[in-house]
Amino acid sequence: IMQRGIVLNEGNRRVILDDGDGSEVYRRKPYTIRTLDPAQEKVDFWMVNDIHARDSVFQLLIKEAPEAQPDFVCLNGDLASQTETEQTLWDACLGSASKILTPAGIPLAVTRGNHENRGAYAQHWLDYFPTPTGETYYTFRRGPAFFIVLDGCEDKPDNDPRYYGMGDWNEYRRQQAEWLKGVVNSDEFRAAPVRIVLMHMIPGKEDSWYGEQQIRRLFVPELAGKGIDLMLCGHYHRYHWIDDGSRGVDFPILVNSNNDCLRVSADAKGIDLKVVNTAGAVIKQHRIDKKNK
């Protein structure tokens, strides 16, 4: 649905009614959404990843969001191990997101993980998470931060027997790399005070799995030296802070575990990161002071 006449950074409502006269929609206040505003001085967002249908863990990780009011929550891949039906996504975490985040007006930013490529219903991913590009890679601006969302695709070669010859992820990564060249040379990217990459998988080392090596070969040359401030990933199911250049990039990479929530606050001066466990305790912290890149 194309909505016109919306106001930046203010609550907006759209109510769609059917013939169900007297249904619950008449008995509750309509939910609101807050539109993106590039003039916003600070952006706060949370990230969870690798839920793999552990909905009870997901609920613990986002339960404080309605009170904290982050600008959005990023679901950074692998919501389920494979998607066989529409119900798979709902049971994995979207049902809880609709009960906890939606009434609070907190939107989602979603990346596709490698496991989202698996299962009979995998091809419907973009039906639930449409993007401005019509692809699983896209960009958006929230406050001072320009976000690049990338799809690392599968972690194994396309000819792996588990894919039944149905995937062409090598070509999809090449397609993204070409698109990425235009993104990092765009006025929108260059004008942003903060630049963050969201991707489920991480650029690899020489001994990494195939997909990670392809990410390094194709994506890293387009990202390194371009003024990226931070990359946020998942996939490993454990925490890593990588700032030693071992992945071929000149910016830090934070890999979030599958049991924690990453809370990020960014403005023109820098980025603050807190890793919070299911009990609500901060277990890791980082500060990135903004440099002129």
Where are these regions (language model features)?
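N-terminal active-site segment of His-dependent metallophosphoesterases
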Residues: R4, L8-Q87
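Active-site environment of divalent metal-dependent phosphoester hydrolases
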Residues: A53-Q59, S81-T85, R112-Y121, D155-N159, ...
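Generic beta-strand hydrophobic packing signal
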Residues: Y31, V73, M231, K274, ...
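Alpha/beta-hydrolase fold active-site loops
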Residues: K42-V43, D71, Y137, P144-A145, ...
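Active-site-proximal segments of metal-dependent phosphoesterases and phosphodiesterases across multiple
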Residues: Y163-E171, D187-C233
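Active-site neighborhood of phospho(di)ester-bond hydrolases with catalytic His/Asp-centered motifs
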Residues: W46-N49, F72-D78, I106-N114, I196-H200, ...
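Extended active-site neighborhood of metal-dependent phosphoesterases/phosphodiesterases
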Residues: I1-T32, Q87-E188, L218-A224, H240-K274
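A short C-terminal boundary segment appended to hydrolase-like catalytic domains
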Residues: V264-K293
